[in-house]
Amino acid sequence: MELSPRAAELTNLFESRIRNFYANFQVDEIGRVVSVGDGIAQVYGLNEIQAGEMVLFANGVKGMALNLENENVGIVVFGGDTAIKEGDLVKRTGSIVDVPAGKAMLGRVVDAMGVPIDGRGALSDHEQRRVEVKAPGILERKSVHEPMQTGLKAVDSLVPIGRGQRELLIGDRQTGKTTIAIDTILNQKQINSRATSESETMYCVYVAIGQKRSTVGQLIQTLEEANALEYSILVAATASDPAPLQFLAPYSGCAMGEYFRDNGMHALIIYDDLSKQAVAYRQMSLLLRRPPGREAFPGDVFYLHSRLLERAAKRSDQTGAGSLTALPVIETQAGDVSAYIPTNVISITDGQICLETELFYRGIRPAINVGLSVSRVGSAAQLKAMKQVCGSSKLELAQYREVAAFAQFGSDLDAATQALLNRGARLTEVPKQPQYAPLPIEKQILVIYAAVNGFCDRMPLDRISQYEKAIPNSVKPELLQALKGGLTNERKMEPDAFLKERALRLI
């Protein structure tokens, strides 16, 4: 029996409709909350979920899958868990946790998820980047060779940092770790103002982990007053935020910094501080019933920090020659650098700047212990003139500390020992610097050159700061610019005469 044209047409229509019935059909995998509390939700039914995938709870709160077990999935909640109840639906998003990145982020304050919290509206043009990505491989990297100037005499002369380096700031609470980090951000202002191309500009990302809101507010005010917020991004996971957000914040900040690194630009990222991130991760791990190890930290706490800090790198010329410099901060308890987290991070980084309470109270600020501080790769990036000027100063300081310990017994000292003590006292005085007053590198070179060459030896210690202020204001700008290259014999004569003449006025 043949179908009429009308019936055949209808049959074809039905067949095509049935064939395309599932074409635009969206299937969501959903699960149900079994238990919830302390920022952790156990969810049943998400069998296909990936590790690190973002999920959405019924009340709109987001979470991330961390524990994949036989029956349940352990999910950390990015927000308050009070509105989540047993039996609530949980939906997979199918995407790994990502955050916004790009130049639109500059000048903004965001939370660990990249959501603006500064009350200045939504973000404009930006791209999304995953918070967890693999660090650049060996062939994609280049050795550190460009200086990253902090504006601090003690750092730029004795523990220099290069673009792409990881330099740890370690010390007890209230020793000036955050101040060094902020000074470094402020110093980029004058470097960026002189930059002639994008490849010279340095962008900054500051990640505040577990700090008080008032402290973060003061930091924002300091950066705004110095017009430093225009090239900076602030990521804040304060003490009142849940542990999962404090754990996530450094990775979010790193993803924002990687945007600049991967596009041939330079960025500096400060993690303040990673001790609090480790504590937040310990809290999450124990609540997820992971077995505790040393100091109750989970076994993978080393990997927590190593996978983060390995993402700071200097890229090769073939991959854009960008860089990401990391300054992680670690807080020690009573100066114990041999604790678990400090030793972990020391072994990951390319050097450390050690700050001590005793030096801080003695008025040596920044309170850097030059003997314990080291920069493993920074000397390759140090300016030639600075290297020439301060080459012997570290050795002289070490000799001074050794001799000063014996000199306090009051025995008679010969002329050579007395000269060493005089020089050492001045070399200890010169690196002192007030808070939020970074010094351009060429002015630093002149000040240190004067101290190393003995122009301050007969000067009272309390006049050294006056001498320092008098130097830069009277030096020809051409000479300051020339000092950036290196000190030839011809160039040395002009500063020598000038510095001696200034010193004689203050003796």
Swiss-Prot record:
SUPFAM superfamilies with a match to the protein in the record: C-terminal domain of alpha and beta subunits of F1 ATP synthase (SSF47917), N-terminal domain of alpha and beta subunits of F1 ATP synthase (SSF50615), P-loop containing nucleoside triphosphate hydrolases (SSF52540)
| The entry's keywords | ATP synthesis, ATP-binding, CF(1), Hydrogen ion transport, Ion transport, Membrane, Mitochondrion, Mitochondrion inner membrane, Nucleotide-binding, Transport
Subcellular location per UniProt equals: Mitochondrion; Mitochondrion inner membrane
Q: Does the keyword ATP-binding apply?
A: yes
Q: Which Pfam families match?
A: ATP-synt_ab, ATP-synt_ab_C, ATP-synt_ab_N
Q: Gene3D superfamilies under this entry?
A: 2.40.30.20, ATP synthase alpha/beta chain, C-terminal domain (1.20.150.20), P-loop containing nucleotide triphosphate hydrolases (3.40.50.300)
The protein's matches in CDD domains, at most eight in alphabetical order, are given as: ATP-synt_F1_alpha_C, ATP-synt_F1_alpha_N, F1-ATPase_alpha_CD
**Which residues does this entry assign to the site Required for activity?**
S373
Subunit notes for this chain? F-type ATPases have 2 components, CF(1) - the catalytic core - and CF(0) - the membrane proton channel. CF(1) has five subunits: alpha(3), beta(3), gamma(1), delta(1), epsilon(1). CF(0) has three main subunits: a, b and c.
HAMAP family associated with the record: ATP_synth_alpha_bact (MF_01346)
Name the chain's protein.
Answer: ATP synthase subunit alpha, mitochondrial
Organism encoding this protein: Brassica napus (Rape)
